[in-house]
């Protein structure tokens, strides 16, 4: 249950990515994921072994453990999206919100990404919220679809009829 601002750390966020925005960014996969632990690490302090282990754990969950030392700009769109999901996961969220997560990735990466999100939902009991304009496509992968229009939220699809 999320109730107050102290619960904001229970929400992970994955922004819509653009390959051009990461192309020259001089940070490794490991460093990108670690940024979501800075509130626990402390200002101007080095990560402890437990922080590094947590980063390794989430990179493994998203199948990016072999890319930890690679620069983010040297990855494909699908790989970058997995890194952003790992970044969200590292803070142990109860909910992950993804903004247009399949923008800029190919069909195979898209299918793999949705399979990963489904696995996280089922195995880790994380609620996944996807912001998308492609209702038809996401209906293949989701349990429910809501529409937000003029401050009104409506259920427009439910796999189980609930």
Where are these regions (language model features)?
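Conserved ABC ATPase "signature" region
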Residues: 30, 48-67
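Catalytic Walker B motif of ABC-type/P-loop ATPase nucleotide-binding domains
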Residues: 96-99
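Conserved ABC ATPase signature
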Residues: 71-75, 79
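Short loop immediately C-terminal to the Walker-B catalytic DE motif
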Residues: 102-103
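Conserved catalytic motifs of ABC-family nucleotide-binding domains
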Residues: 92
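H-loop/switch region of ABC-family ATPase nucleotide-binding domains
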Residues: 132-133
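H-loop (His-switch) and adjacent beta-strand-loop-beta switch element
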Residues: 144-158
